[in-house]
Amino acid sequence: DMTTDIGAGGNALPYRWRPMGFEYKGWSYVNERAIATQQTGFWFVGQSRHDLPDVVGGVIWFGTDDAATSYVTPIYTCTDKVPECFRVGNGNMLKYSPTASFWINNRVANACYKAYNIMAPTVKEAIDNFENEQMGSKLAEMDRKALKAYNAILPKAERKGLDSKDWFASVRKMLTEYSVGTAQKQFENWVALEELLLVKFIDGNVKAQNADGSFKHSKWHEGT
C-alpha cells in the first residue's frame, strides 16, 4: 500500500514523483509505479453486451488523466459525434483548454496531490455517485429506449433488406445524443467540483458544510 510507506509523506500520497530512482548508502533503489498514474492521457474500458443489437450493445467507458481522480463516462460505440470536451484539437497535453476534459481532470487531480488523504475522498465520492448512477439506472434506461426503437424498425428493415439503407440511423442519433450530452454534463460537474475543492480546502483548512452541501458560516460572518 503506497499510501502508508515513508514516501507517502504526511498526506498518504500514493504517487512518487520523478526521478523514480535514488541511491542510499551505496545502494540503488527505484520507487514503484502506482497503478493509477498521473501520467495518463486517456483510459477506457470496453463493454460488449451480446444480448443487445450491435447498434446498442457496445459501450466505451471513457476517461481522461489520472484514473484515481477521474471518472469514466459511457460512450455508445455507434456514436457518430465527439463531445466537445473530448474533441481532437481542443487543447492538447502541452496546450491548456478550459473546455477540455483532460485539463479539468488535471486541475482536480493536481489539487488533490497537495493533501491527498483529505481531498481525494471528496473526489472519489463524486466519481462513485456518477458512475454508479450510470451503471445502475441511467444506462439501463437508455438501453430500453433504444431497444424499443430498434425493435419497432426491425420488421420493416428485414422485409426490405437490412443492407438496403441505414435503417437504424434514428437509434444511432438517440444514443449519440445521450453519449455527448452525458459527457458534456459531467464535464460541467467536474468544473464545479474543482471550484468546490478550492473553496472547501482553501489555505489548508477544511470548511464545514451543511447537509445540502452549502458551507457553514460562523455567527460573526454577517457583513463580511
Regions found by a protein language model. Give the residues of each.
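C-terminus-biased signal that marks the final domain/tail of proteins
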Residues: 1-224
